[in-house]
Amino acid sequence: MTVRKKAFVYLIRNSEAGPQLLVFESLDEPGFEVVKGQSKPGETLEQTARRELEEEAGIADVLFLSRLGTTLWNGELQGFCLMKAPPGIPARFQHTGTGDGIDCGVTYSFRWLPIDDTLRALLVQGCDAFIDELIARAAVALGRE
């Protein structure tokens, strides 16, 4: 049996209000999602995360900070990456997906949310798997600027 692999991206940045996480409005249910997507054959988790960020959000030149953890859900190995955003990304923006997957042509509405205890209630199920680790590591990771 082949195990499918998926990368979830916790893209973070510093703001005047504190650490923030990039999310988009879910098209399927109330709440927000993070950028995510299936790995292509031979891709590492980091490579998948970088590709998905570029395809779904139009963002490149991110800094890979760490792997927060992995879960197994419905036969799918889901890895969660902590990445730092480059400067200059707007507070809110839209991007139309590129690439050859199901996201191609889909327009996503992105925004930044504060990284705190309220985040868990705002994210759709599955995207919230490593929120505690995100909260614990984000301030430290961003404090090194």
Sequence positions of predicted segments:
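Conserved N-terminal beta-strand and adjoining loop/helix that marks the start
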Residues: 1-21, 41
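A generic fold-level signal
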Residues: 2-4, 16, 75-76, 105-107
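Active-site beta-strand termini and strand-to-loop segments that position acidic
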Residues: 11-15, 26, 83-85
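Conserved Nudix-box catalytic region and its N-terminal flanking loop in Nudix hydrolases
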Residues: 17-59
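Short, solvent-exposed aromatic-acidic interface loops
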Residues: 26-30, 99-104
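A short coil-to-beta-strand element that immediately follows conserved catalytic motifs
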Residues: 59-69
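Active-site-adjacent beta-strand/loop module that shapes the phosphate/pyrophosphate-binding cleft
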Residues: 71-99, 110-117, 126-140
